[in-house]
């Protein structure tokens, strides 16, 4: 049912309660103003959410798979599988992480060598 002003609801037991909200799916509720909820049995009262994909089991076990908030943050509840390159600004995340791990490994080797030299100079004390 669509109880919010300028709202629409489609599907089975879907409810659009927020102003200018839209809900479609099974047991979904769009309870935030200017929001859209799809899927099934999304979590209720998700503050600041504009877009929600619900993946709950039933009305007593509500949960979200994905959320986009008015702050610009996106929240994935579960693993994110990426087929392609992930960039953070201009940086290829996987390449940068690999480079950092390699640098840390090199530094650990240097530290171990320096520790050995220090022990030799101090007589192991």
Feature roles, as predicted:
Residues 9, 13, 109, 116-118:
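Positively charged, low-complexity intrinsically disordered regions
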Residues 114-125:
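Short, low-complexity, Pro/Ser/Thr/Gly-rich segments in the mature regions of secreted, periplasmic
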């Amino acid at each position: 049912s669509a109880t919010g002003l300028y709202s629409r609801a489609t599907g089975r037991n879907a409810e659009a309660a927020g102003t200018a909200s839209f809900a479609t799916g099974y047991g979904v509720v769009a309870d935030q103003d200017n929001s859209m909820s799809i899927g099934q049995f999304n979590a209720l009262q998700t503050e600041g959410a504009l877009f929600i994909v619900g993946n709950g089991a039933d009305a007593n076990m509500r949960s979200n798979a994905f959320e986009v908030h008015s702050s610009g943050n996106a929240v994935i509840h579960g693993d994110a599988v990426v087929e392609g390159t992930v960039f953070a600004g201009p940086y290829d995340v996987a390449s940068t992480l690999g480079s950092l791990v390699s640098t840390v490994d090199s530094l650990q080797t240097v530290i171990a060598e320096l520790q050995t030299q220090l022990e030799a100079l101090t007589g192991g004390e």
